[in-house]
Amino acid sequence: MLLLRHRFLLFFMTVLFAVKPVEAASCLGDKSSQSSYSVYLVPRISATKLYQEWAPFLERLGMENGLCFVLRIPADFTEFEEAIQTGKPDFVLLNPYHQLTVVRKPGYVPLVRDENSELSGLLVVRKDSPLKNIQQLNGTAVAFPSPNAYAATLLIKALLAQKNVHVTANYVGSHSNVYRAVALGAQQAGGGANTTLDHEPKELQSQLRILFVTPEFMPHPFSAHPRIPQKVREKVITGFLSIANDPSGRAMLKSIQLAQPIRADYARDYKKLEKLKLERFSVRGSD
């Protein structure tokens, strides 16, 4: 147990000192473009991995549509949430809860989403954990990535509350941190999402067992600030759809979890989530 704690502390010291914002050093796409547009991503997994997945796609999207993108990955959830609330991103990949919170002010408009890949929250435990059901978590502590993470925190908290299961939340900074904390035995259970667990190394996945899965909901939309001209928004939408038409493009889109992009519509795709009243479980100024 002491060895596990030591390894856990070393891991989080590494994460603490490694965390910093990631920004593309130069334009991704058409470098002759007179305008550049920022693209923000929520730091659900490591910034390095996000950059490796998104930079090639944005380079192609920009080159094919005469656009220049600057990729920005905030250091943590709090910085990301502050950015979207103040309208800093021109374009941003939002979790569905964040889309609810910014659809009116600053007014972010969902442009595209994946057609088939739906999002589920997960509660994971170690593979050898004695826990068999979520009722056994009542009165215990559970790891979550951040207060306002959509599938990994808010959906799980809402559904646990419906079942009269009350837990104390330990926020550890990211989905990746949750999985590692549980695997190392530092946390008995943790909240994540199907889309992020699938990104983890097979060796780590093999150490975990899924205890609970939420119903599926719409995945993250790629959204635009209302200041972006309609002509530019349309270029981005048609660019996504066009890239999906060839094998190399589909591989890029699959890596960013938008394998089959379609036009998104707030009223059709996300307004229904308002009925869940997830704000009861959110923490203002966090995520």
Region locations from a protein language model:
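Short loop/helix-cap segments at secondary-structure boundaries that form the rim of catalytic
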Residues: T101-K105, E200-E203
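Periplasmic-binding protein-like
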Residues: Q34-R44, N116-V125, E203-A244, K254-E279
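N-terminal hydrophobic or amphipathic helices and topogenic motifs
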Residues: L2-L4, F12, A18-E79, Q85-G87, ...
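Pocket-lining segment of extracytoplasmic ligand-binding domains
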Residues: S129, N138-K231, T238
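Short helices/loops that flank or line small-molecule/ion binding pockets
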Residues: T78-V92, K105-P106, Q135, S176-G191, ...
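Sec-exported extracytoplasmic/periplasmic mature domains
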Residues: G62-G66, Q85, A161, V165, ...
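A structural signal for short loop-to-beta-strand junctions that line the ligand-binding cleft
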Residues: P106-E115, L211
